[in-house]
């Protein structure tokens, strides 16, 4: 996705709906209509607001950001790009040009939820999650919490776990403790 692509164009793109359902779901929660009509996908990421939806989704999807300076192009993983509140790994002479997101397949599970005072307000807390479906359950869990920390944060306990229905409550309890 090009960095200057408006939120509304991402939300209305058939390709996003088909191959990036996590983004398709979360983009509808971004701000209010005026912001979605004028704001850009890359702008949300470069701004690095810890309560914003797109940084969390980029981390959950293991996105790569393409940064361009006069002399070179650099690729940075989303998890390494966000350093803190509105602070990124972008150098002063660079601009964010492209966001590379791996397509989600029918074997990929995802979830997105945020809690805010009203629709369009900043998230008080939210979660973006991805996983791979296997016959035994879910693997490669990436559960990213946002809105309550300095930057989107991956739950290390969830990332190191596989999930079958019988141990879902146990994992949920461990993740809650990890994030406390």
Q: Which residue stretches match the model-derived regions?
A:
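C-terminal structural segment of proteins
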Residues: 1-180
């Amino acid at each position: 996705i090009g960095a200057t692509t408006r939120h509304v164009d991402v939300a209305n793109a058939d390709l996003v709906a088909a191959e990036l359902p996590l983004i398709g779901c979360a983009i509808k929660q971004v701000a209010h209509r005026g912001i979605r009509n004028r704001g850009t996908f890359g702008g949300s990421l470069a701004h690095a607001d810890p309560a914003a939806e797109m940084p969390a989704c980029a981390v959950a999807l293991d996105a790569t950001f393409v940064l361009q300076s006069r002399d070179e192009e650099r690729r940075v993983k989303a998890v390494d790009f966000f350093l803190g509140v509105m602070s990124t790994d972008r150098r002063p002479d660079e601009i964010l040009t492209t966001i590379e997101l791996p397509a989600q397949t029918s074997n990929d599970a995802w979830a997105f939820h945020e809690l805010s005072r009203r629709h369009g307000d900043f998230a008080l807390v939210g979660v973006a999650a991805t996983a791979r479906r296997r016959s035994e359950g879910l693997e490669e869990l990436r559960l990213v919490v946002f809105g309550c920390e300095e930057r989107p944060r991956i739950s290390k306990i969830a990332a190191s776990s596989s999930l079958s229905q019988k141990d879902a409550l146990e994992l949920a309890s461990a993740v809650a403790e990890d994030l406390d």
